Amino acid sequence: MSKELLTRWENIETLGNNQSVYFYAWGGDAQINAYIQWAAQQVKTKYNINLVHVKLSDTSEAVSRVLAEKSAHNNDQGSVDLVWINGANFATMSEHALLLKQWANKLPHFAYTDPANNPAVNFDFGIPTNGMEAPWGQASLTFYYDSLAINEQTNNKLPTTLNELLNWSTQNPGRFSYPKPPDFLGMSFLKYALVILHQQSSENIKAQLNQAATANNTAQVLTPLWNFLNKLHPTLWRGGTHFMQSGAQMRRLVDDTELSIAFTFSAPEVPAAVKRYDLPKSIRSYAMADGSLSNTHFVAIPYNASHPQSAQLVANFLLSPEAQAQKQKAHIWGDKSVLIQSRLTPEQQALFKTAKPHPSALPFNSIKRTLSEPHPSWVNAIMQGWQTRYGVSQ
């Protein structure tokens, strides 16, 4: 760290101690909530910071609050000090100048992410972060299945590509489905399909996925998706005439043996559900061979945060090897670390060594190919097109 950055950080440590930080973050998962409480205990000990988890049902609630404060000219006493964010919500906050700039790239622990060679920490759904977000974790679309129903003995081969999934669902009607948009998981499956369907497209068409959806490019980009869904839907649960509302409902249908294959964007959710008896012991996790839709999630500081220095101390702690290793443990959260192991000391690397994983957990290094998220604007384009074509019967 340069002398200038060191002096800057010393000032932040001085100003950031002995304050409260209001951390607006989704509160729908008990494991994640418990991890945030652990982090709160650590920053209390290190900096006498009182980290308050303001639980959200949707991150857009925090976005709306900061936007309202800006409209009311509250430019320095905001209620949100730190927010868990990525994708469309980051795009909205960036577009409306609601975020503090050029701080995340100056955190001491940011260097552990190898930013010069790691686009995942410099871009969020294709949009440059410009130091407005500190990376916190990574997630990938993970599939899981009932190994009693799908195995060599039953002559039922596990589908490992999108095309194989279509063929499998055709041969096993009613055993697969996905939550309907705008559910996050349902949208993730549709984005995975869209990216895969364009793997053989021209570079110009593929480039459109990283750019804003427009009236001119929407039909051309989305037509392959509608053609695919027209083939897939008749093979789905309830003949594709009805879709579940959420990932939790999809998981219950697997537990009830109505579905044989499902998916999640939180791989640790699978072994956790098996341990809670919400899924059978025969469940196994795997990654699609043609690629796994993946993204990085971040923490950001609103431009009008009341305690921006304290929020930076918290964000830097969340990036520490200690905090990232704790977060990656399957029984804690199981969220993949954003740190690059080669940038760590042997002692720091040792923190990440774990015991034998649960049989239903995603095997280590299963994900061989990651797929980047399309531009956030494609979410609305897909959602509107899906509703027009398939939403009437819902």
Q: PLM ranges: what are they?
A:
Residues 74-84, 259-266:
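Paired acidic/hydrophobic, glycine-rich loop segments that form the ligand-binding mouth/hinge
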Residues 13, 90, 94, 163-166, ...:
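Non-transmembrane alpha-helical segments in soluble domains
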Residues 237-300, 304:
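Extracytoplasmic/periplasmic substrate-binding proteins
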Residues 66-75:
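Short, well-structured alpha-helical segments in soluble
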Residues 8-17, 24, 29-50, 143:
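Short, polar/charged alpha-helical segment
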Residues 292, 297-366:
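Mature extracytoplasmic/periplasmic domains
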Residues 3-7, 252, 359-394:
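Conserved C-terminal helix/tail region of periplasmic/extracytoplasmic solute-binding proteins
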